[in-house]
Amino acid sequence: MSRRCDLTGKAVLTGHLVSHSNRKTKRRFLPNLCNVTLQSDVLQRSIRVRISANALKSVDHRGGLDAFLLKARDEELAPRVLELKRQIVKAQAEAPAAA
């Protein structure tokens, strides 16, 4: 399991831990990843994803998983979530035709 956010693409960064005397030792900055279950209103089901805490706030801010995925760039999304985005777009296209 990689340490990468499924929605925003945030990953591990490397840098230095700098002491008071300015000595530098290598360190890793890990993303704050959470395993969460989000509800898709269009697909009428819940989806389990591993996302950063920042992405969780962004999903809430945009009004849910469906709205977030529709605005998100495809390059940032994990392949599994990208397939989910395509399913949402397809379901939305079929919904007005059925109504």
From Swiss-Prot:
GO CC term (a single one): cytosolic large ribosomal subunit
SUPFAM superfamilies reported in the protein's UniProt record: L28p-like
Pfam families noted in UniProt: Ribosomal_L28 (PF00830)
InterPro entries the record matches: Ribosomal_bL28, Ribosomal_bL28/bL31-like_sf, Ribosomal_bL28_bact-type, Ribosomal_bL28_sf
Domain of life: Bacteria
Magnesium as UniProt keyword: no
Name used for this protein in its record: Large ribosomal subunit protein bL28
Annotated source species: Azorhizobium caulinodans (strain ATCC 43989 / DSM 5975 / JCM 20966 / LMG 6465 / NBRC 14845 / NCIMB 13405 / ORS 571)
